[in-house]
Amino acid sequence: MSKIILKTSRFLLKSPVEEDDFDQITKIKSDPLVSNTQLYGKVESRELCRFMFQHYITDARITKTRRKRWVFGIYPLEVSSTFPSICYIGNVGLSKKNVKSDTANLFFEIGPLYWGMGIATECVGRVIEFGSENNIQNFIIDPIIGNEASKKVALKLGFEDSGTFVTAYNGLQQHIYKLSKQIRTG
């Protein structure tokens, strides 16, 4: 299994997540504050969560040359009053449509206890660096309409509003934000 560890000044980002993380993953994904802003909707049990998101672990079994998706669990580096334990607090994912694509979608979620602390911006930024190091030149963030926090993260990271809206598989509207190599280096 291929393990990847990234760091920011405050967080460790690990791919794959650990099996033991699924209790916390379920807690976050079943919180209406989170699930109401995500395409997957409400997750009502650990078993359903594990079934729906097993790729958080199994993608790491795919060889580097064939891999097209990475999900990084976010873990605080240090225990503090804000982070009383070193445990899973959210994730950032990177997904290409196919192995040869130079474009990837980013997705992310943070437990509501940790909103407003710049965690998503910091960790998504680090995953963009990882993607760039792995020949991804263009990035897309596509929050559902009404997910203002994800929109703010995209804009803080330099993404441009494409003015495009798409309808997802479940009928929800998504707003497309793009970040290209030209924007990052321009």
UniProtKB/Swiss-Prot annotation:
Gene3D superfamilies: 3.40.630.30
Enzyme Commission number, as recorded: 2.3.1.-
Main location, first listed in the record: cytoplasm
A family per Pfam: Acetyltransf_3
Entry's localization field: Cytoplasm; Nucleus
Top-rank taxon: Eukaryota
Family designation: Belongs to the acetyltransferase family.
Protein name: Uncharacterized N-acetyltransferase C18E5.08
Species the sequence originates in: Schizosaccharomyces pombe (strain 972 / ATCC 24843)
Taxon lineage: Eukaryota, Fungi, Dikarya, Ascomycota, Taphrinomycotina
